[in-house]
Amino acid sequence: KEGYMGSDGCKMSCVINDQFCDTECQAKLKGSTGYCYFXGLACYXXG
């Protein structure tokens, strides 16, 4: 599933690193990869 993970506490973790977003996307959205969209401070999951 692709898309932004929403406002479920990803803003702070996004500032820290992309790895957290990547892990969250794989675990919660069953996506293949995830990265931080810095301008919006949100995780984006791809695949």
Swiss-Prot record:
InterPro entries: LCN-type_CS_alpha_beta_dom, Scorpion_toxin-like_sf, Scorpion_toxinL, Scorpion_toxinL/defensin. Keywords: Disulfide bond, Neurotoxin, Secreted, Toxin. PROSITE patterns: LCN_CSAB (PS51863). Pfam families: Toxin_3. Expressed by the venom gland. Residues 1-47 form the LCN-type CS-alpha/beta domain. Disulfide bonds join C14-C36, C21-C43. GO terms for cellular component: extracellular region. The keyword Disulfide bond applies. Transmembrane segments: none annotated. Has the structural arrangement of an alpha-helix connected to antiparallel beta-sheets by disulfide bonds (CS-alpha/beta). Causes transient paralysis of the rear legs of and spasms in insects (A.domestica). This is Putative beta-neurotoxin.
